[in-house]
C-alpha cells in the first residue's frame, strides 16, 4: 500500500507505485510517474513530465522536474527521466529538457547527488556518478559513468565530463574533461590519470599503464594537439590490454565540440 502523508499533495493523473512513500507536504504533479520502493522526502516537489524509476530516494525540499531556466522555453511538454537506485539529496534542483535539444534531461542508475546540486535542462548523467554538494551543472552538460564532480564546482553549458574522470572541488570547467583524467582549478586544468579510481573499478595494471602513456602524449610530451592525436591512435592500436581504454579516450577527444582541457 502506498504510504502518502496526509499533508502531501498528489495531483490526479500521477502514476504512483503502491510501494512508494511520500513524506509530509511533498507535492507530486499530474504528469509524474514514480516507480516501486521510491521515497519522496518532506516538502519536496516532483513536477513536470517526470519519470522516476525504482528504489530512488529523494531528499527533503528537492525540486525535481521543474521548468528549464531557458528564456526560449514556451511550456512545451519536455521531460525528465531518472533511472533506478539514485540518491538525490536535500535542496537539489533538476530541470526538464528543452525542444532546442532532444527535449529530455536524463539520469541513469546508481547515482549519488548530494545536497544543493543543480542539474540543468537537457543534461545527461550516466550511471554511478557522484555530484558533490553545491556542484552546478549548466544546460546540456554530459557526464559519463563513474565520473565525480567536487563540491562548489561550476560546469559550463555543453561541456562533457568523461567516464571515470574527476573534477576537484571549487573548480570552474569550461571545456571537456577526457575520460579517466583528473582536473581541478579555475579554470580547470589536467592533473593526471585517475589511477586510484581505476584500480577500485577493476582496471588492470596494463590498462592503467596505457592510459598513463596516453596522458603523457596528450599533455606532457610537448606535442601539438594534432600530433598527439596521431600518436594516440597508434597507441590505441598497439595490441595491448589497454587498447580499449585508449580507444575510448581517442573517440571522446574526436567528438569534442568545445575542445578538451589543456
Curated annotation (Swiss-Prot):
Transmembrane segments: none annotated. Pathway: Glycolipid biosynthesis; lipid IV(A) biosynthesis; lipid IV(A) from (3R)-3-hydroxytetradecanoyl-[acyl-carrier-protein] and UDP-N-acetyl-alpha-D-glucosamine: step 1/6. This is Acyl-[acyl-carrier-protein]--UDP-N-acetylglucosamine O-acyltransferase. Its EC number is 2.3.1.129. It holds the Pfam family Acetyltransf_11. It catalyses: a (3R)-hydroxyacyl-[ACP] + UDP-N-acetyl-alpha-D-glucosamine = a UDP-3-O-[(3R)-3-hydroxyacyl]-N-acetyl-alpha-D-glucosamine + holo-[ACP]. Keywords: Acyltransferase, Cytoplasm, Lipid A biosynthesis, Lipid biosynthesis, Lipid metabolism, Repeat, Transferase. Homotrimer. Involved in the biosynthesis of lipid A, a phosphorylated glycolipid that anchors the lipopolysaccharide to the outer membrane of the cell. One of its GO terms (biological process) is lipid A biosynthetic process. GO terms for molecular function: acyl-[acyl-carrier-protein]-UDP-N-acetylglucosamine O-acyltransferase activity. Its main location: cytoplasm.
